[in-house]
A protein has these predicted regions:
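Active-site beta-loop-alpha junctions enriched in small/polar residues
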Residues: 29-31, 57-59, 80, 131-133, ...
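Anionic-ligand binding region
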Residues: 87-119
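Conserved Radical SAM active-site core
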Residues: 1-74, 84
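Non-cysteine beta-strand/loop elements that form the S-adenosyl-L-methionine
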Residues: 69-84, 156-163
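Short, conserved beta-strand edge motifs with alternating hydrophobic and charged residues
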Residues: 53-55, 76-79, 100, 127-131, ...
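Auxiliary Fe-S-binding modules of radical SAM enzymes
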Residues: 112-204
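Short glycine-enriched, charge-decorated loop/helix-capping segments at active-site entrances
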Residues: 2-3, 89-94, 172-181
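Alpha-helix-loop-beta-strand connector modules within alpha/beta enzyme cores
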Residues: 39-53, 99-110, 182-193
Length: 204
């Protein structure tokens, strides 16, 4: 990597747009929100028109999200864990579930449900991702029910099946319960749980 100032980042955004990129995707930007805001303001002032995607773990500070209101078009958060104990054990962040709920509420307040243009590309709204983990069907079900009840039954959901045990998880018996890939049955059950909750818009 290399250090860039706000103008240089804005230049890159505009260059990507000129090359035909469909959006400007900011991946895991939670720790550099002030710099993101400065760069976006510069790029928009210079004509940036592509949708801005905020791609996040959902472990975001509310103040940071509120400062992005009007700058971000598409929020793409993960919702990883429902239980504090699971978040503490696997992510060392026991407050993740409530932080994610607060963050996703704020994201939806700003941009609403995901909407598409005539070209079939997403233009504005919320897209929530959930990574299916082995043995965590009940947590997935709780997440989906909350999304349907508290955010919107029209929430666009990406149920992701690509979990792989790596690094310590793959070698250390402390994480034995997640030291395997989810089964096809677990993935199917995640989709079924989402449908039972009332969700119906899925990324495939």
């Amino acid at each position: 990597g290399r250090k860039l100032d706000a103008r240089e980042i804005a230049n890159l955004m505009l260059e990507l747009e000129d090359r035909g990129c469909h959006n400007i995707n900011l991946v895991t930007p939670e720790h550099v929100v002030p710099q993101v805001i400065e760069a976006l303001a510069e790029a928009i002032a210079r004509g940036l028109a592509s949708p801005v995607v905020y791609n996040t773990s959902a472990y975001d500070a509310l103040d940071s999200l509120r400062s992005l209101d009007g700058l971000v078009d598409i929020y793409m958060p993960d919702f990883k864990f429902w239980e504090r104990a699971t978040a503490r054990r696997l992510a060392k962040a026991k407050d993740y579930p409530e932080r994610a709920r607060e963050a996703i509420r704020e994201m939806h307040r700003q941009v609403g449900d995901l909407r598409f243009g005539p070209d079939g590309l997403a233009r504005r709204g919320l897209l929530v991702r959930h990574l299916v983990m082995p043995g965590q069907t009940a947590e997935a079900e709780a997440i989906f029910q909350w999304l349907a009840d508290e955010i919107s039954p029209d929430t666009f959901l990406n149920v992701m099946a690509q979990y792989r045990p790596e690094h310590q998880v793959g070698r250390d018996r402390r994480y034995e319960e997640v030291a395997r890939r989810p089964t096809a049955a677990e993935i199917d059950e995640a989709y079924a749980a989402a449908r039972r909750a009332g969700l119906w818009r899925f990324a495939r």
